[in-house]
Amino acid sequence: MGQKVNPIGLRVGVIRTWDSRWYAKGQQYYENLHEDIRLRKFLKDKLKNAGVAKIEMERAAKKIKIIISTARPGVVIGKKGSGIDALKAEVQKLTPNEVFLSIQEVRKPDLDAQLVAESIAQQLEKRISWRRALKKSIAAAIKGGVRGIKIRVSGRLDGAEIARSEWYNEKSVPLHTLRADIDYGTAESLTAYGIIGLKVWIYKGDILSAREVEEAGRVKS
C-alpha cells in the first residue's frame, strides 16, 4: 500500500499533522474546506516565483492564520514589508475572516521534495536534459544529508513518440515504514513535446516516539 498512496497522507496522525488545522461541522465545514482550497490556489499562483514549499492554515472564530513556508522569504515580504502588506490585502478580499500571514523560511530547499520537484520542472522548461536535472538534484540532496531520495519522471522524454516513465533513486526510501519521515512533492513541466510529470520522495530519517527514544537510550547505556 505504501507504494500507491501519498506518503504524507498515510502518515497524518502518526508522525505528520494536517496542513489545515481547524474544526467545523455541517455547512461550515464545507465552506471552510472550499475557502482553504481557493486560498491555497491563489497563493501558489501569486507566489510561483517565491519557492513556496507548503501553505498551512489555522482557524479560530472569525480569524484565519496562513503560514507560508518559502525558500525566498524576501520575495514575499518585499522592501520594508510592502510585499506582505499587499499580499495580505489581496487575500483579505477572498475571505470574510480576519487574515494573519506568517512567513517561514525553508533554509535547505534541496531537501524539500516539493521544491526539488518544482526546480526540476523549471529546468526542463529551459530545455535542460532531464537526466542531468535529476542527477544534479539527487546529488544536492545526498550532499545535504538526506537518507534516501527517489524521483519519477513521466512523459515524452527526449521527444519520444511514446510516453514512458523513468525512475532515479539513491539509497533507500522505506515507504511502508510509518515512522519514516518521508517528504513528497509533485510538479508538471510544460515542454515543447507536452507535459512532463515529476514525483519526488525524500527520506529524512525515522521519527521515534518518546517511548522508543527512552528504550534506545537504555540499550546504548
From Swiss-Prot:
Entry's Gene Ontology molecular function annotations: mRNA binding; rRNA binding; structural constituent of ribosome
GO biological process: translation
Keywords, comma-separated and alphabetical: Ribonucleoprotein, Ribosomal protein, RNA-binding, rRNA-binding
InterPro entries: KH_dom, KH_dom-like_a/b, KH_dom_type_2, KH_sf_prok-type, Ribosomal_S3_C_sf, Ribosomal_uS3_bac-typ, Ribosomal_uS3_C
Keyword Transport on entry: no
Pfam families: KH_2, Ribosomal_S3_C
GO CC list: cytosolic small ribosomal subunit
Keyword Ribonucleoprotein: yes
Ranges for domain KH type-2: 39-107
Subunit architecture: Part of the 30S ribosomal subunit. Forms a tight complex with proteins S10 and S14.
Annotated family: Belongs to the universal ribosomal protein uS3 family.
Function description: Binds the lower part of the 30S subunit head. Binds mRNA in the 70S ribosome, positioning it for translation.
Protein name from the UniProt record: Small ribosomal subunit protein uS3
Record organism: Bdellovibrio bacteriovorus (strain ATCC 15356 / DSM 50701 / NCIMB 9529 / HD100)
Lineage: Bacteria, Pseudomonadati, Bdellovibrionota, Bdellovibrionia, Bdellovibrionales
Gene designation per UniProt: rpsC
